[in-house]
Amino acid sequence: MGRAFEFRKERKFKRWGHMARVFTKIGKEITIAVKQGGPDVTGNPRLRALIQTARSENMPKDNIERAIKRATDKDQADYKEVVFEGYGPHGIAVLVEAATDNNNRTVANVRSYFTKSGGSLGTSGSVDYMFDRKCMFRMKTANPYDLEELELELIDYGVEEIFEEENENEEKEIVLYGEFTAFNTIQKWIEENGYELVAAEFTRLPNVDLKVLEGDAKADIEKLIERIEEDDDVQNVYTTMQP
């Protein structure tokens, strides 16, 4: 198995603090997708995938519709996607993805989280190179398949790693990781080849050796991550600490 499998194995049970956080995160992504590609799911594959993701998280239909409507509401400020890079205590690199309608607020908040933890917010590019941007899909099918043959076929579509895992209902799903730019190509293949798209997202995988921390040192980083993730503007947090 590759690094995507190991990374996911460590993180798959690490969820946002509660359901409302999940809905807020997906809702912002839906709004941004509508802004970029329009509200018609037929011509907006990213929106189509996000709606499937929302359904897999049991996000109410009203929440999905509100997120779509927000994108077309001229009275609502646009969300801006921003990335923050820095170092937490013990030399751990931290990359934060946010979606905000008030950049000044978000910058001030994120900087304070780093400072209070004994870390520091860095400049653009200071830790970004330690993480590779990827797309991730979860799909399933009732039909028989051969995972090795599937992997060989999907390599031509930008898939770099494929493996199986069980979801919370103990149903088998196929997980795909691919090149960041291959999102639409992979999604199209899934939709055209009889597989059910369960969820899809963009993510980052560390490309450096992860640092092992224990005891109080590990707790320091976990506290920083928790503080950052509690911010409503924050979408994702990645670090170079071994989970």
Which residues make up each language-model segment?
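N-terminal cationic and glycine-rich segments that engage phosphates or anionic surfaces
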Residues: M1-Y113, G118-G122, V127-M136, A182, ...
